[in-house]
Amino acid sequence: MTSIAGVVLFPGAGSSSSHSSLVAMHDALSPLPVARHDFPYRLAGKPFPDKAPVLIASVKEHVRAFAESLGVPTSQIVIGGRSMGGRMCSMAIADEVDPLVVAGLVLVSYPLHPPKK
């Protein structure tokens, strides 16, 4: 069994990495290293999310950088998020060209279908 070295969490479309559910998970997992990241559109002050490929690339970038900062492979990192953040994590793992290999996936309020469908 792989040991878990840390967790990376991503927010939903309408919130930031300081959303109460992400903060609660962060606090509950202490002292395990936990990183919470905002997506690029949020950091740029845009009201609407980027397209999925941009969001998925952001997930991969943050997870790989976090694993590197801990000196472990991504296979020792658990990733997840709330709503859209969780969906993008699941899509990063399922990517057929460049799948993100992780220890586990946490989904909170996972959207089973795209908005308004």
Residue ranges and their predicted role:
Residues 62-117:
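Primarily recognizes the serine-hydrolase "nucleophile elbow" in alpha/beta-hydrolase
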Residues 1-76, 87, 91:
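Serine-hydrolase catalytic machinery in alpha/beta-hydrolase-like enzymes
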